[in-house]
């Protein structure tokens, strides 16, 4: 593509994935100083002082601020589709808190994921997830904010209720019947974990997608970094590299997601593995993005 990728997408990264060992303020400062990034995804802050420092940096940066509530659920093992109503309410409460924190930091919405499920109670879990998501969307709507559900694997690692893509489409359609501030977040690194292609996922979920992530996964059992670990592009025995990202970009172009007037956020969901250097891994991702974009036909 002769046009810059920044014309059609707000390129972001997930702060806590890119810099898992950094002090969060140092990390935000470093990313805010990098003009490759148009967006940043942040999560829950440990205290008011740190949150205030982050807000000050973000306000100066001209970065689009996005808020990922996934760690709020994964860390304490809260489940928004918990069939136990008390458990479900706890998950809902932290997502409501996330809306408030996101608003304070300048984000226009939050993203989260579904929880674990059992085959025998899948329909009940689905109903519970609808209840949670509707309540959170109703609260967010009062603030003019959106709520995005990230599609995950259903049997490999996170084993979340939502995907695969057709099931995510059903859920999104049900949500849109009542809440127009709901959308889906899709992640290239999750496609191999749901045994799906970029074309299938994007075409299946097209009306509901509001946000993109890119990354990699190892789906060969017994291999290092197996599951939903988000290793760098080109990691040994992994599923995604330049060609797969090029295919992803091609599908987004064909399906009408190149939007210069109101660009979608497209964020790196890539994490250093073991003792890998975070800055080299970020540079690796940028190189792969630049190469795949350069190969994309106008």
Task: Give, region by region, the residue ranges found by the protein language model.
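A cross-domain feature marking catalytic cores of carbohydrate-active enzymes
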Residues: 13-17, 42-44, 67-71, 112-114, ...
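A short small-residue
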Residues: 74-79, 109-116, 228-229, 267-269
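Acidic-and-aromatic substrate-binding clefts and catalytic sites of carbohydrate-active enzymes
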Residues: 17-23, 39-54, 118-120, 155-162, ...
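Histidine-acidic metal/acid-base catalytic patches
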Residues: 1-12, 21-30, 36, 106-108, ...
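N-terminal pre-domain/capping segments
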Residues: 1-99, 103, 141, 179-181, ...
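Low-complexity, flexible helical/coil segments
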Residues: 45-52, 74-84, 97-106, 145-150, ...
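Short amphipathic alpha-helices and their capping/turn segments at secondary-structure boundaries
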Residues: 46-65, 94-104, 130-141, 197-210, ...
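Active-site acidic/histidine proton-transfer and metal-coordination neighborhood
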Residues: 2-3, 81-183
